[in-house]
Amino acid sequence: MYSVKEIFYTLQGEGAQSGRAAVFCRFSGCNLWSGREEDRLSADCHFCDTDFVGTDGSNGGKYESPSSLAEAVEEQWLSYDLARRYVVCTGGEPLLQLDSDLIAEFHKRGFDVAIETNGTIDVPKGVDWVCVSPKGHVAVRVRQGDELKLVYPQNGVNPSKYLSWEFDHFFIQPKDGLDVDLNTELSIKFCKENPRWRLGLQTHKVIGVE
């Protein structure tokens, strides 16, 4: 049984795959925050900007089997050209639910499988693109992948600690919220002073897509 908040077709708005057409499969639940506002300040991740609670989003629900969920994702793919299909498994924390059987069903339908994870749970074999976004001082198990995205700034977190990890791309993303303008200035300054890092923006918010 898979609990899914929403499934929708859009453009990837962040990171090295920015601009690529994708079906987003947002799983319900997270191991770093309940999703309830009354728990935010005490959560291991208190700056999340995503609603991952429940199954009431577009195409959300309880999916009984890997094939039923993969079919629901496939139905959202609107392109009929020869481009490789792409599904982004996100959350919440997708690795609480994503497993090898579901990955195999996605592959059977011609999808590359990407995940956006906090890195606290090992990645199943078969995932094609791994994006890890460390949160605060939470221990990270996944120290290799395709890209590391650090929301910045985070109290007491020095980005340099991550540069020894095995990732192809390192992104600094300004923390959203009331201080987003200041955080953007700080992120730009940091990237100019530390050019191994690239500035990562949430372009889907800039252009007004989901």
Predicted regions and their residues:
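Generic secondary-structure boundary/loop-capping signal
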Residues: 1, 8, 200-204
